[in-house]
Amino acid sequence: MPRPISATIHTAALANNLSVVRRHAAQSKVWAIVKANAYGHGLARVFPGLRGTDGFGLLDLDEAVKLRELGWAGPILLLEGFFRSTDIDVIDRYSLTTAVHNDEQMRMLETARLSKPVNVQLKMNSGMNRLGYTPEKYRAAWERARACPGIGQITLMTHFSDADGERGVAEQMATFERGAQGIAGARSFANSAAVLWHPSAHFDWVRPGIMLYGASPSGRAADIADRGLKPTMTLASELIAVQTLAKGQAVGYGSMFVAEDTMRIGVVACGYADGYPRIAPEGTPVVVDGVRTRIVGRVSMDMLTVDLTPVPQAGVGARVELWGETLPIDDVAARCMTVGYELMCAVAPRVPVRAE
């Protein structure tokens, strides 16, 4: 019999979250971002819940082909573009849209032999300083793209670095306007944070990612509490043992936690080999039998231990939610000095996953 740990993907929550995007950006089309195997959820598992989108955005050609095989006939955007000239053959065959962010990609499109023009998103580096043409070079890149017979529609694209923070988007939007002055075309700027908090950045296409999965772009669950988003992944397990610690006794590697009084602890079938962060400190929240409690001791490879003081009735077999419908993933991530994105993507292959 398998270990009791499992992850559940909530299809209805995905559809709900897409509808929240549309409420916030009612005049925009939506690229549903499903990179990194749909933020660890599984591309095939999220497809039924997100198929109401206008397009999908991702990184890998293999995942783009998989979407076509799942029956998706609409737009698919390669967010980092392509890396070799042979990739363009796949782009052409499967009618993909690609980002273009450097001269080497432009050169490959100029020399490609295509059955039809490729739609592109011409990316400006407006301040993130990762990918994209500088504002000073953007017009020349746009003119070059317009002159290329292998390029069809050109969408103007940039990416925000601080849409979830105090700096916001105004500075980058102003930078973009300077670099793209006089250039007409559809625009795609807004990530999840901009969808939620910066309506002036919505334009023609929005690119929500983390909000589709029910977590906060800021990493703070309170920031999205009133937005109607629902968690799309629940990681759950069970108690596989219960121990009673006497005052002064410790639990786990390194004896990191010492009981201040007699107490019951539960042993949970979940550890860092399942993708749960080893760095999780004492006090990281968990939910046992519907009651919120805390981790005590160090997370080990296959197990972690929890305080059963708030839930005295819990015994072997009691359900434990590590994050999900009852416990926001952002609350767990915050205690672990990380973000919900990372926890979702880190769920290990050995954890059974099902969609409902």
Curated annotation (Swiss-Prot):
Sorted alphabetically, which InterPro entries does this protein's record hold? Ala_racemase, Ala_racemase/Decarboxylase_C, Ala_racemase_C, Ala_racemase_N, Ala_racemase_pyridoxalP-BS, PLP-binding_barrel
Instruction: List its EC numbers.
Output: 5.1.1.1
Query: Could you name the Gene Ontology cellular component terms for this entry?
Result: cytosol
Q: Which residues bind substrate?
A: R130, M301
| Pfam families found in the cross-reference section | Ala_racemase_C, Ala_racemase_N
* Catalytic activities: L-alanine = D-alanine
Q: Top-level EC class, please? A: isomerase
The cross-references to SMART domains, in alphabetical order and at most eight, read: Ala_racemase_C (SM01005)
Q: Which pathway is this protein assigned to?
A: Amino-acid biosynthesis; D-alanine biosynthesis; D-alanine from L-alanine: step 1/1
Q: Where is the signal peptide?
A: none
GO terms for MF: alanine racemase activity; pyridoxal phosphate binding
Gene Ontology biological-process annotations? D-alanine biosynthetic process
Cofactors, names only: pyridoxal 5'-phosphate
Active site per UniProt: K35 (proton acceptor), Y253 (proton acceptor)
N6-(pyridoxal phosphate)lysine, modified sites = K35
Entry keywords, A to Z: Isomerase, Pyridoxal phosphate
- What HAMAP family would the database entry show? Ala_racemase
Instruction: Report the sequence similarity comment from the record.
Output: Belongs to the alanine racemase family.
Function noted in UniProt:
Catalyzes the interconversion of L-alanine and D-alanine. May also act on other amino acids.
Q: Please give the name of this protein.
A: Alanine racemase
Species the sequence originates in: Burkholderia mallei (strain ATCC 23344)
